[in-house]
A protein has these predicted regions:
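Sec-dependent N-terminal signal peptides
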Residues: 1-2
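Phosphate-group recognition and catalysis centered on beta-loop-alpha active-site segments
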Residues: 9-308
Length: 308
C-alpha cells in the first residue's frame, strides 16, 4: 500500500478555514449519494492510526481514501479557545517531540498543557515522527496537532469511495479530574464544540461522543437534536451504563470486548445504534460484524472496508 503524505493546512487562520469549509459544504451538498442506514459504518479511529500518526491531517485523508465513512477524533481546547485534535490535553512523549525535536519525558509531558498553549504554539510540536511498537505498520512522518477547522477544511475536499459525504465523530475529552487545569467545564466545552460545528456547516453530519456524562448532558441540553454517543470502557450491564445518563443517547459505544450479541439486540431494540471501539484484527472485526453491530471504530479502516 502506498501511503499519502500531507503536511496539512499549516499557515491558514482558523477563521478563514471555517469560512472556506462552510462554503465548500454549501457548494457540494447536492452532489453526494445518500448514506444507506443499514450498511456497516466504518469509523477511522483517530484517522487511521494503524497506518499513519494519530489525529493528524495525513491520517484523516488516508482514512477516507481507504474506506472510512466517518472520521473519529479527540478534541481538546487551547488557551485561545481553538478546538485542538488531540487524545491527551498535553504533549504525550510517546508520540511527540518538543519544538527542538527532543524527546519529551513522562515527567515533562503534562507541563506542555494544551489548555495553556495557543494553537500556533501547539503546532510547533512534531507528533508523528516517533515510532510506536504497538503499530509496526504505521508510517512515521513529521506532523502536528491540527485544529478542527483545519481538519474539516481538508476532509471536505476528499472524495469518499462510495460517493457519500464525510461524517465526523467528535470526542469531548472532559472529566472532573481534568477540569479546570486541562479543560474547561462541561457546559463551556460543549458550547464551544456546538458553536464550531454550526459555523462549519457540518452539524447534520456530526456525532458528539464522550466518556463524560456531564459533557454529553451539556450537549443534549444545549442542542437536543445533536447526535450523541455514550462511550463505555467499564464493565456493567447495558442498562446500568445507560442509567448514568438522564436521556437516551443515539449510539452506545463500548470497548469491543464489553459487548455481545444479546447486548446488541437489546440496544437495537431500544433504537440505539451500537458502534464498539477499537477492533483492529480481521478476527475481531469479523466477530463484531457477526454480532450485527451498526458500525466499528478501528485503527485499520482499510481492513474493515475489504470485509464489508
Amino acid at each position: 500500500m502506498t501511503l499519502l503524505v500531507l503536511t496539512g493546512c499549516s499557515g491558514s487562520s482558523t477563521s478563514d478555514s471555517a469560512t472556506t469549509a462552510s462554503e465548500s459544504v454549501q457548494s457540494q451538498e447536492d452532489t453526494f449519494v445518500e448514506v444507506d442506514p443499514n450498511r456497516l459504518e466504518i469509523q477511522g479511529h483517530r484517522g487511521a492510526r494503524g497506518l499513519v500518526p494519530e489525529n493528524s491531517m495525513p491520517g484523516f485523508v488516508l482514512a477516507l481514501r481507504e474506506g472510512a465513512d466517518v472520521l473519529e477524533m479527540d478534541m481538546c481546547i487551547s488557551s485561545d479557545g481553538q478546538i485542538i485534535i488531540s487524545h491527551e490535553p498535553w504533549m504525550n512523549g510517546q508520540i511527540c517531540l518538543d519544538p527542538n525535536n527532543a524527546p519529551i519525558s513522562e515527567n515533562q509531558a503534562k507541563t506542555w498543557n494544551l489548555h495553556n498553549m495557543t494553537a500556533e504554539e501547539i503546532a510547533e510540536f512534531d507528533c508523528g515522527s516517533v515510532a510506536l511498537p504497538d503499530f509496526p505498520d504505521q508510517q512515521n512522518l513529521p506532523t502536528y496537532k491540527p485544529t478542527l477547522d483545519q481538519v474539516v477544511e481538508l476532509a471536505e475536499t476528499v472524495p469518499l469511495l462510495d460517493g457519500a459525504q464525510v461524517r465526523y465523530n467528535l470526542e469531548i475529552k472532559h472529566s472532573a479530574e481534568l477540569e479546570p487545569e486541562f479543560c474547561p467545564d462541561a457546559t463551556t466545552f460543549a458550547k464551544l464544540v456546538l458553536d464550531k460545528v454550526s459555523a462549519l456547516g457540518i452539524a447534520d453530519r456530526v456525532c458528539i461522543q464522550s466518556f463524560s456524562a456531564a459533557a454529553l448532558e451539556a450537549v443534549h441540553q444545549i442542542d437536543p437534536n445533536m447526535t450523541t454517543s455514550w462511550l463505555v470502557g467499564t464493565e456493567g450491564t447495558v442498562q446500568s451504563q445507560l442509567d448514568k445518563l438522564t436521556f437516551t443517547p443515539d449510539i452506545y459505544s463500548p470497548q469491543w470486548k464489553l459487548i455481545d450479541a444479546k447486548d446488541v439486540a437489546q440496544l437495537q431494540g431500544q433504537d440505539i445504534r451500537v458502534i464498539p471501539w477499537t477492533a483492529n484484527t480481521k478476527e475481531d472485526l469479523f466477530a463484531l460484524i457477526e454480532m450485527g453491530v451498526n458500525g466499528i471504530i478501528t485503527d485499520r479502516p482499510d481492513l474493515l472496508y475489504k470485509m464489508r
